Amino acid sequence: MSSFLDQYKRQPKLFIDLPSKGASYDESVIQDQQYTQLPVFGMNTMDEIMIKTPDALFSGEATAEIIKSCVPMVKDPWKIMGFDLDYILLAIRMATYGDKMPVSSNCPMCDTQNDNEVMLTKMLEKIDSAQLETSVKIKELTFKLQPLTYKRTTDISQKHFTLQKQLATIEVADDKETDKQPHREKLLRAMGD
């Protein structure tokens, strides 16, 4: 029996096929391991509020929750690979606001503001046509490659941000240059880890 409210339920706006075709994903990432025809819903009010919360954005939690809300077939957004993530986020943007995204820029020479529109379907096509390379051979060495997950990318970004803030603190300190150098070297080594 259907309710008269069924017509007001949130409906998928588009369906997407992941560019990776599910390569490197286990059953915990996408429901039923369905990598094609994933329904994409537009953001709701709660999603809009979450995307404007700085702490949730910095931690990556806002993006993960919005993906779960708008692409419910994704069970664990933290395990999504980078180019699939870009594809999903573009699809959510399209489902919410439409195919055109306004972009503004100022000319560095004359300071004139230029307003344009980006067609998001073109961007999706570009991502979709990319080939996923899983190995690279250089002379006699073969390197096995795996794209970064959203979790790994977020962790790296947070670590890098923290180290940059610490480095900036060292630079503005009134200490002598010779006192700053060991602290700088320690932080730069930490950045490389």
Describe each region flagged by the PLM.
Residues 1-193:
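Long C-terminal interaction/binding lobes of large macromolecular proteins
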